[in-house]
């Protein structure tokens, strides 16, 4: 194996490892999208009901999004979280202080919720199914797992290439990384489109702002790393095979 190809192979492996770590961290964390709003310092009856609805198993899209808006919510692929006061005061609001303790409460999406239809008017089951948002939601949480699976399968093939001391299997590894990058890019695109469509239907309150979080950024960084790793794997395999063919033809001649 030529030193150039070995160097390209090692660099591609490093890029692949980094992108896999980023993708796994992105899938496992809850900061794809974050909302910023004034923290509700008191725990009135209405606030308690909102928290219970948010943490319930049957919360619809409109219900949990309204709570996310009001309580500094964060949204991941599998969980939704809100920030609420740690100490509740049912009789009266606490005195205003410079800071107070808060706690984060999270609720996981069930598989039924992940595959549940989205409605034209969120929360209104009689408004008809919004097919675009429904399939965008399903793709945004399925594609990252497909991407991660392709990366792991490509790593196994790369390991076989090392054992066989051959660069030929790395062509398949490169193709798998290319497909993984496309899946990651598709997931990010679906997530952005889904968030924008949601905010067109459910407007944010005036004192609430939203932004993409660091989990989303990790997924965005992972995609180009996968593409670069794929390019190096494919280049190393293709060029090495081409030089081997030329060398074989020269020896025959």
From Swiss-Prot:
It is found in: Cell junction, Tight junction; Cell membrane. It comes from the Eukaryota. Glycans are attached at residues 42, 72. It is a multi-pass membrane protein. In the brain, highly expressed in endothelial cells of the cerebellum compared to other regions (at protein level). Its main location: other. InterPro entries: CLDN1, PMP22/EMP/MP20/Claudin. The keyword Transmembrane applies. The chain crosses the membrane at residues 5-25, 141-161, 175-195, 216-236. Keywords: Cell junction, Cell membrane, Glycoprotein, Membrane, Tight junction, Transmembrane, Transmembrane helix. The C-terminal region is required for localization to tight junctions which occurs in a TJP1/ZO1-independent manner. Belongs to the PMP-22/EMP/MP20 family. Plays a role in negatively regulating the permeability of cells to small molecules. This is Claudin domain-containing protein 1. It comes from Mus musculus. The lineage of its organism: Eukaryota, Metazoa, Chordata, Craniata, Vertebrata.
């Amino acid at each position: 194996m030529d030193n150039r190809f070995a160097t390209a192979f090692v660099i591609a492996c490093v890029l692949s490892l980094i992108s896999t770590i980023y993708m796994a961290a992105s899938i496992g964390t809850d900061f794809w999208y974050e909302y910023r709003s004034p923290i509700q310092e008191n725990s009135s009856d209405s606030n308690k009901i909102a928290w219970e609805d948010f943490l319930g198993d049957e919360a619809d899209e409109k219900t949990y999004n309204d709570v996310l808006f009001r309580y500094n919510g964060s949204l991941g692929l599998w969980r939704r979280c809100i920030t609420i006061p740690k100490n509740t005061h049912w009789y009266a609001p606490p005195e205003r202080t410079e800071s107070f303790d808060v706690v984060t409460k999270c609720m996981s999406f069930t598989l039924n919720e992940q595959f549940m239809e989205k409605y034209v008017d969120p929360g209104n089951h009689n408004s008809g199914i919004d097919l675009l948002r429904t399939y965008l939601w399903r793709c945004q949480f399925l594609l990252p797992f497909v991407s991660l699976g392709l990366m792991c399968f490509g790593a196994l093939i790369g390991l076989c290439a090392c054992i066989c001391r051959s660069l030929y299997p790395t062509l398949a590894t490169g193709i798998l990384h290319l497909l993984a990058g496309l899946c990651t890019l598709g997931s990010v695109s679906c997530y952005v489109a889904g968030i924008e469509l949601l905010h067109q239907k459910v407007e944010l309150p005036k004192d609430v702002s939203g932004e993409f979080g660091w989990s989303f950024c990790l997924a965005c960084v992972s995609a180009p790393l996968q593409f670069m790793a794929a390019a190096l794997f494919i280049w190393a395999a293709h060029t090495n095979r081409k030089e081997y063919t030329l060398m074989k033809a020269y020896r025959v001649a």
